[in-house]
Curated annotation (Swiss-Prot):
Subcellular location: Cell inner membrane
Annotated membrane topology: Peripheral membrane protein
Cited CDD domains: MPP_YbbF-LpxH
Name of the featured protein: UDP-2,3-diacylglucosamine hydrolase
Organism: Pseudomonas paraeruginosa (strain DSM 24068 / PA7) (Pseudomonas aeruginosa (strain PA7))
Amino acid sequence: MSVLFISDLHLEAERPDITRAFLSFLDERARRAEALYILGDFFEAWIGDDGMDAFQHSIASALRQVADGGTRLYLMHGNRDFLIGQAFCREAGCTLLPDPSVIDLYGEPVLLMHGDSLCTRDEAYMRLRRWLRNPLTLWVLRHLPLATRHKLARKLRKESRAQTRMKAVDIIDVTPDEVPLAMRRHGVRTLIHGHTHRPAEHALEVDGQPARRIVLGDWDRQGWALEIDANGHRQAPFPL
């Protein structure tokens, strides 16, 4: 059996093509896998488990069916859905992973991240990230009225899109020097992350030893999945 990794689906009711592709992916591939790891930005936005709508409940139900079939499900926060909590995870049958996390993958320690924390050259975003992830900020956000949270989420998404268009490509990508630092800190030679929407595999050295960074693809014009088993790994796109 294999282990699957996906990220950056940005699921929302307004993109039924992505939803259909994801449900097919669950039926055709995830049910046969040992585990599925979703490394952030699973949803386009998340205002809190208490604000789940019918669409989000339907996604949780689909995940639960896969979990009940024996596939282990793991979910990591992204920059769009960091308010996902234990209520959703219980409903979906998945385990919420901290970012970063180290897992044992066929005898090798592997570092998993969403990836946004590696983009340190984007100083404005890093300041916003630190503020949003502050425990006090999280508490306040979760206790705001739902209508206020919806309004704030729309505002943040609009500003994020505008700023991304204005920033240089290298600013919003991973800072190269941060990668070996993170890998050395966690004692790994393999890092898997998403966030940048630039699927690729990068070779590097950490303390003189060969290492690799696998970047997951986003689900916009096509879907992406990384599949790893005891014999190797393969990341490939597929149509929505």
